[in-house]
Structure formats: structure tokens, C-alpha cells
Regions:
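Active-site proximal beta-strand in glycosyltransferases
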Residues: 53-55, 69-88, 106-109, 126-127
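A conserved, positively charged/aromatic
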Residues: 87-105
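Acidic anion/phosphate-binding donor-loop and adjacent secondary structure
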Residues: 90-92, 132-148
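Donor nucleotide-sugar binding/catalytic pocket of nucleotide-sugar-dependent glycosyltransferases
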Residues: 102-139
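Conserved donor-binding/catalytic core segment of Leloir-type glycosyltransferases
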Residues: 145-161, 167-173, 181-184
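A short, basic/aromatic alpha-helical/loop segment that forms part
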Residues: 158-163, 174-176, 189-191, 211
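Nucleotide-activated donor-binding/catalytic signature segment of Leloir-type glycosyltransferases, i.e.
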Residues: 185, 193-216
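Acidic donor-binding loop of glycosyltransferase active sites
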Residues: 222-226
């Protein structure tokens, strides 16, 4: 398939318009693949389209698409991108998630520690693909002293993400510390809203600002030291 223009399908359970990580990743990967000349279609399921290659995000929730594509096209490449939910919740207890990994030609993980959650027999077909971001322009004079050391946490408030871990760690810092935590991301439940508000009440170092547009998230990231 080298130097060929491929018809590539990307399956993600996240619906169009969603700000969830899987949809954002699908859009970014599609943009990169199109820039290389390939034709890319993003869907929530696989309905028998004649793709040369299928990329499925989420081993468990995309299992039906993975199984059908493998059955209909046993010789075509099938890539399964493992999400954090796959690695740290679903794989230990879901036979379907584990079956998706066996059906894949290649597995993608986003960080090397993910290998620790995978059976050793799958390591050979697993690759780390680091997420990237466009360079930021310099927005501050580096000679101007920084009043606080700002650490930003970017991610939706979901229990599986352990979203308040940074805030809890910040509580242990000495009074002289200048560390401040700013948390960007939507709350998936009212319980998470209440937890975030409670954390702000008891922890002056922590501030949750909810879901923000992409330009604003990038701006916060640029202005953070960590």
C-alpha cells in the first residue's frame, strides 16, 4: 500500500459535534491523513463500507465495528486505538474488549506506560503514537517574573479519570508554595459538579472553569508552567 491513496475509515463512539476526546482525536487524525492525500470517513459504526483500512477508537465500544470489518475483510489492516477507559477499566473485565485487541493488526496507545496494562503477547503489534499540538506563539516577556506557578489540568470530569488528583496533591504543599491548579473540562454528572465546587471551597489553590472553546484551552495551556 506504499504511496497509494487509501480509503480509510475511522470509527469512534463519540457523536458528531462532541467535545469528547475520542471525537477530537478522530478529527485530528483524519485531518493528518487527508493532508497525506488519503480519503477519510469518520463514523460511529461500520456498516460494510469498502475501506482499505479501518481505525477504531475504543476497543470495547467499537467492538461490533471491529468484529464486522475483520470478518468481511480478513486481509485488510485493522488498527485499534486504545483509550484510557479501555486500558484502566474495560480490558481487565471485558471479554469483548480483549477480543478486539486480538482481531487488530496493530494497536495504538498514547503513552509507553500503557504497555503495563497489556498482555505481553500483544506488545509486538503495539505502537506508541504521541499526541501533538501546533506550536504556540510567545505571549509573555520571559524576563517578567511569574507571580504564581500555574499547572493546568485539561480533561472532562469523569470518575475514571480521577480528576481531582492534582488538586488533592496541591493541598499537601507548604503555605509558601506558589503552585495554582486550573482545571479545564466539562462535568459529566451533577456529582462531579458538586465535587469540583466543594474542592474550590476547601482548596484555595484549585480553580475549575468548566468546558471551554478550543482557542481558550490553548490560551490557558500557553500561559501555564506545567
Amino acid at each position: 500500500m506504499k504511496n497509494e491513496i487509501l480509503k480509510i475509515g475511522i470509527v469512534t463512539p463519540a457523536p458528531p459535534g462532541s467535545r469528547h476526546g475520542n471525537r477530537v482525536t478522530a478529527l485530528r487524525w483524519a485531518r493528518m491523513l487527508r493532508s497525506l492525500g488519503h480519503r477519510v470517513e469518520i463514523t460511529q459504526s461500520y456498516e460494510g463500507e469498502s475501506h482499505d483500512l479501518l481505525i477504531a477508537l475504543h476497543a470495547l465500544r467499537s467492538h461490533d465495528a471491529i468484529r464486522r470489518f475483520r470478518c468481511e475483510h480478513p486481509d485488510r489492516p485493522l488498527i485499534v486505538a486504545l483509550t484510557g477507559t479501555d486500558l484502566y477499566r474495560d480490558l481487565p473485565k471485558s471479554k469483548l474488549a480483549r477480543q478486539s485487541l486480538e482481531l487488530a493488526s496493530r494497536l495504538i496507545v498514547l503513552q509507553p506506560k500503557a504497555f503495563d496494562a497489556l498482555p505481553e503477547g500483544l506488545h509486538a503489534k503495539t505502537r506508541v503514537v504521541y499526541q501533538s499540538v501546533k506550536p504556540f506563539p510567545q505571549i509573555r516577556n520571559p524576563e517578567v517574573p511569574i507571580r504564581n506557578f500555574q499547572a493546568c489540568v485539561i480533561g472532562h470530569l469523569r470518575e475514571i479519570k480521577d480528576p481531582f488528583r492534582a488538586a488533592m496533591a496541591a493541598r499537601l504543599l507548604p503555605a509558601s508554595s506558589r503552585v495554582r491548579i486550573i482545571h479545564v473540562g466539562g462535568a459529566m454528572t451533577e456529582k462531579m459538579v458538586a465535587s469540583a465546587r466543594r474542592e474550590m471551597e476547601i482548596n484555595p489553590r484549585y480553580r475549575w472553569i468548566g468546558e471551554q472553546p478550543q482557542w481558550r484551552v490553548r490560551q490557558i495551556l500557553m500561559r501555564s508552567q506545567l
